[in-house]
Structure formats: C-alpha cells, structure tokens
Amino acid sequence: MDDARPAEDPSRAGDTGCTSLFVTAQDGLCLHVRAWGARGGRGLPIVCLPGLTRNGSDFQELGAVLAGDAAQPRWVVAIDSRGRGGSGYDPNPENYSFPVELADVLAVLTAIEMGPAIFIGTSRGGILTMLLGAARPAAIAGVILNDIGPVLEPKGLMRLRGYVGKMPTPRSFEEGAEILRRLGDAQFPALASEDWVLQAKRTWKTAGSGLVLDYDPELSQTLADIDIERPLPPLWAQFDSLARVPLMVVHGMNSDILVSATIDAMRARRLDIDVLQVPDQGHAPLLTEDAVIARITAFVTLCDVSALGF
C-alpha cells in the first residue's frame, strides 16, 4: 500500500471505529477512503461506493457489522468520490463524470492493493460498479446494487436536480434534519427525528462557526442536462457484465429512480438475482436497519462460498 497514506484529518473517522486513508488520483486530486476491519480477513473484502452527493459515512453501520463478524471477518472500505466527503473538490466540474470517477475507483483499488471484492454501490455508486464490471471484471466477486439498475427514471432524476447543491444552509443539524425531512418525508415516512438528524450530519459538515454541504455544490452540473422527455440510454450491456458473479439488488419500495418494471427486466436476464425490498424507504435505502444488514450479511457469505469455496 505504498501509494495510500494514513489520514491527515483523523476527525474524518470520528468515533466510528474506522480508519482513513488518502490516495492520489491520476490528476493529483486527493481521494479519501474509509476502512473498517483489517486486511486478510477470512471473508472477501468489500468496496462501498456511495451515491451522487453522498460519502462513505453512509456505510458506517453496515461496514462495522461486516468487518466485525466474528465468524467471517473481512476488510471493508468506502471511497469518497471526488468532490464528496473527505476527497478533494475538483476545480473543473466537468470532471464529475463517470469516466473520471471510474478512473478514481481504479486508482484506489490499485493503491490499496485490493484483490477481487464484493462491491456495494448506492445509486451513482452502483452505476460505477456496473461500469467497473465491463472495464475490469476480475476485480468483482459479487455485487449489491442499492436502488439502481440499468434504467434510471427521468422523474426521479428531475427531483434530485431540484435540490442538489441548492438546499438552504441550516444553522444547526436539527434545522438541517427538518430541511431533509421536508424533502424526503414522502419517500421515507417511517424515519424518526433522530434518523433525520443523523442524515443531516452526513449531509452537512461544520466549517468555522456554521455548517456547509459535505459535497461540492457544483455536482449539480451532473444533472443539468436531464430531460424528462429524453430518457438516459440504458446500461444493459454493463449490467450483463456482472453475469458471472452473485448479484443482489436492494430496492426502496417508494423509489422514483428504480421501479418495479426495471427489476422485472433485471430478473428476466438474471434468474438468480436476490432482490431485497425495503418498505417505507425510497431512493436510496439507508442500509442501517438490522434486518437489512442481516440480509446483506447472508448474501456476502454466499459470495464467499461462490468465490472461495467456504
């Protein structure tokens, strides 16, 4: 791991039980990686890729459980894409693109000497996972797509475009929680007040005497050209690149990005796909509930059997 260095800002790990690494991308930008557990565990390692404006803190609960499994300990890492979390912000917003972000993932995998791994991709992170399956299939030993598939619903993308980079600045995390609740209550009606506060703490960060978004507001440019009358090209070829490895899809039943018709089409191409339906959640499921974590734990154990024979 000569190309990865320990955290310069240990507070990024906080009290979460994870450690931080920084990796330099091909263009010199600094990429932040969270890690739970230790390399060389009995189970396959796991690489987590967050959503559009999200960062590796979204995988805190899941990462801690998977890494700390006494029977099957494993190394879990989560990559903050450029412009998110602890990674550097790009002075050229055009670099917030799939080709550049895929190159960043490959740079991190090389720097930390990651072997074949199970990839958990939320939303945009799931698209990157499908692209990785086409670009470097040997890197992947199993996949969990969190509320994403080969077809993205324009209506949902338009909803995201309405607030990404445009939310008002809260004076406290409690006020931020109320902002998020107003935006997301229809998709996440069962979340408690403390859940919204946790999400606020994973959306904004403390800067000076106030709060700022924990992502580059210029990420809004990635959605600027969305046209509800012109759906994005489907990614079926990239989805099919995952055919040789176990596959799970987590579906928020209130989602407006991944819909049932797309899941049915995915099932038609992959009869063995494991679909986990999450009630009372939309885009994207939080992966924090005990029942969801238990299902994911069982799935990654099956990936171990498939790849390692135990």
Predicted regions and their residues:
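Catalytic histidine-centered segment of alpha/beta-hydrolase-like enzymes
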Residues: 281-290
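Conserved hydrolase catalytic core segment
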Residues: 115-154
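A catalytic-pocket lid/entrance helix-loop region that shapes and gates access to the active site
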Residues: 142, 148-175
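Conserved alpha/beta-hydrolase catalytic His-Asp/Glu region
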Residues: 171-224
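Conserved HGGG/HGGXW glycine-rich cap/lid loop of the alpha/beta-hydrolase fold
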Residues: 29-88, 304
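Conserved serine/cysteine hydrolase catalytic core
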Residues: 206-265
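An N-terminal hydrophobic leader/cap segment in hydrolases
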Residues: 1-22, 34
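Active-site loop/oxyanion-hole signature of alpha/beta-hydrolase fold enzymes
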Residues: 61, 67, 72-120
